[in-house]
């Protein structure tokens, strides 16, 4: 999908040597923008830490504390080491979703390449964590509880695990791309007031999709940490 009006449209010219599509160039440009915004926001929130937080530091502590509590409630205390991964992916997805509600900005998560990249990171991290925890014994997760059914269960489990990044990719992409298309249509028909309800719904959809992505990330990692039976 090519957005009709973008502030960073000039990036398409800069990325022409890479032979990217216009939609792909838009996704790359706004992905970089979001990474810079997150880095800048984090720097401003932590450059002058105080015992009694205020302003951006207070907001950041609320966000970090909320994500940390969600990880502990979902995975237990042993989930704390995976906070950087879960929080980074979650915040990136959330900001990517929300930025599309600003006219002239494109949500990178409305491009399937961005959602696939996030899903692949989660997929690889899940199995790296599992192998690190269990070593060669991690293969038991794919064999099932009955020895003579192991070959069949292995095949089924492999398909199930490969479907995880696919479902993460398509769920997020489908929701955000669909919402972006509806907004473009509404803005084309009646640019004032009419798109407002869809934009408000977009805020809710953005938070829900980011929450679901984070929750599934935690569930997948938790599953790789458990002992196989």
UniProtKB/Swiss-Prot annotation:
Gene Ontology CC, one term: proton-transporting ATP synthase complex
Superkingdom: Bacteria
Keywords: ATP synthesis, Cell inner membrane, Cell membrane, CF(0), Hydrogen ion transport, Ion transport, Membrane, Transmembrane, Transmembrane helix, Transport
Membrane association type: Multi-pass membrane protein
Transmembrane segments: 25-45, 86-106, 111-131, 142-162, 181-201, 202-222
Biological processes per GO annotation: proton motive force-driven plasma membrane ATP synthesis
GO MF annotation, one: proton-transporting ATP synthase activity, rotational mechanism
PROSITE patterns linked to this entry: ATPASE_A (PS00449)
Compartmental location: Cell inner membrane
SUPFAM superfamilies: F1F0 ATP synthase subunit A
InterPro entries assigned to the protein according to its UniProt record, in alphabetical order: ATP_syn_F0_a_bact/chloroplast, ATP_synth_F0_asu, ATP_synth_F0_asu_AS, F0_ATP_A_sf
Self-association state and partner proteins as the record states: F-type ATPases have 2 components, CF(1) - the catalytic core - and CF(0) - the membrane proton channel. CF(1) has five subunits: alpha(3), beta(3), gamma(1), delta(1), epsilon(1). CF(0) has three main subunits: a(1), b(2) and c(9-12). The alpha and beta chains form an alternating ring which encloses part of the gamma chain. CF(1) is attached to CF(0) by a central stalk formed by the gamma and epsilon chains, while a peripheral stalk is formed by the delta and b chains.
UniProt record similarity statement: Belongs to the ATPase A chain family.
NCBIfam families: ATP_synt_6_or_A (TIGR01131)
Record's function text: Key component of the proton channel; it plays a direct role in the translocation of protons across the membrane.
Record's protein name: ATP synthase subunit a 1
Gene responsible for this protein: atpB1
């Amino acid at each position: 999908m090519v957005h009709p009006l973008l502030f960073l449209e000039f990036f398409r010219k800069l990325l022409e040597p890479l032979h990217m599509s216009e939609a792909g160039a838009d996704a790359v440009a706004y992905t970089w923008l979001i990474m810079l915004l997150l880095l800048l926001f984090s720097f401003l929130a932590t450059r002058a830490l105080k015992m009694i937080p205020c302003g951006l530091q207070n907001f950041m502590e609320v966000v970090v504390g909320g994500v940390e509590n969600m990880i502990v409630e979902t995975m237990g205390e042993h989930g704390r080491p995976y906070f950087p991964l879960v929080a980074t992916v979650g915040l990136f997805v959330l900001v990517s979703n929300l930025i599309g509600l600003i006219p002239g900005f494109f949500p990178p998560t409305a491009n399937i390449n961005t959602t696939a990249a996030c899903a692949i990171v989660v997929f690889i991290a899940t199995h790296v964590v599992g192998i690190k925890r269990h070593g060669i014994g991690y293969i038991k997760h794919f064999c099932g509880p009955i020895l003579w059914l192991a070959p069949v269960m292995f095949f089924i489990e492999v398909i199930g695990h490969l479907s995880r990044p696919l479902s993460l990719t398509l769920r997020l992409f489908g929701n955000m791309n669909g919402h972006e298309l509806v907004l473009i249509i509404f803005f084309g028909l009646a640019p004032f007031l009419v798109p407002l309800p869809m934009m408000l719904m977009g805020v809710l959809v953005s938070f829900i999709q980011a929450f679901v992505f984070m929750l599934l990330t935690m569930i997948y990692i938790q599953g790789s940490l458990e002992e196989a039976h």
